């Protein structure tokens, strides 16, 4: 819990995805959710509470013990190998929370290409990872975990689902300080460390309009703080101060 956060904290953060997932449950009473690298099962618990048939896979038996204590459906194994064995159009949601930064780019490509194969029309792929737009994350915090491979820019991670044929993609920036969103007076430290420390790519497989329209609001909303937002506001603030000084 020291570095990851308590179970309840993680569950509260994961609720940001519910507006994407809840409509799919209403459209498909037999909706299945697969969580790759499920860890302690916070997302499995949430999707199970929604009424989805949730299943998780992870290599860490210690993590899976927490899932089994909650009677969550899990198994030990390699996530991508498991994904490759699934039938076409058999899943409603495929998720990978803080997985993609641990695998090679070739494995990431395979994950995305297999996800679109196994998802039903209208199904979702969710991939969450540290956000290198946050300079402190990109240059320091990311490397506190020696199993991390390399930071993945949002533009790259969002391109992959587009390349493999997903119909629409949304970047969701996460876990930023809410105080920074409307703060008028930014510091340099705010710029360096204030961009959302995590982000996710949510990608939807194409389907008929009646299905796609159910998620329109979730896909249209804006989420979090980008580095560009903070640098633009900071520059405007500096320019205004220079202008005021020149007028004196």
Where are these regions (language model features)?
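Short, glycine-/aromatic-enriched active-site segment of Class I SAM-dependent methyltransferases
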Residues: 129-148
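Short alpha-helix
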Residues: 149-165
């Amino acid at each position: 819990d020291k570095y990851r956060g308590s179970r309840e904290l993680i569950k509260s953060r994961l609720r940001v995805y519910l507006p994407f997932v809840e409509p799919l449950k209403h459209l498909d009473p037999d909706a299945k959710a697969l969580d790759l690298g499920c860890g302690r099962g916070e997302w499995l618990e949430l999707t199970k509470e929604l009424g989805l048939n949730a299943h998780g896979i992870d290599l860490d038996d210690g993590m899976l013990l927490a899932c089994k204590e909650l009677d969550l459906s899990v198994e030990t194994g390699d996530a991508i190998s498991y994904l490759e064995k699934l039938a076409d159009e058999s899943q409603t949601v495929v998720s990978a929370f803080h997985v993609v930064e641990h695998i090679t780019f070739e494995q990431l490509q395979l994950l995305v290409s297999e996800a679109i194969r196994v998802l039903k029309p209208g199904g979702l792929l969710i991939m969450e990872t540290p956000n290198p737009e946050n300079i402190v994350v990109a240059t320091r915090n990311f490397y506190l975990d020696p199993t991390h491979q390399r930071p993945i820019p949002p533009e790259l991670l969002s391109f992959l689902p587009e390349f493999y044929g997903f119909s629409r993609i949304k970047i969701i920036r996460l876990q930023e300080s809410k105080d920074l969103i409307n703060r008028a007076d930014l510091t340099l430290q705010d710029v360096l460390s204030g961009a959302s420390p995590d982000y996710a790519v949510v990608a939807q497989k194409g389907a008929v309009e009646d299905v796609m329209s159910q998620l329109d609001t979730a896909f249209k909303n804006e989420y979090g703080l980008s580095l560009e937002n903070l640098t633009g506001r900071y520059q405007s603030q500096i320019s205004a101060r220079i202008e005021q000084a020149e007028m004196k």
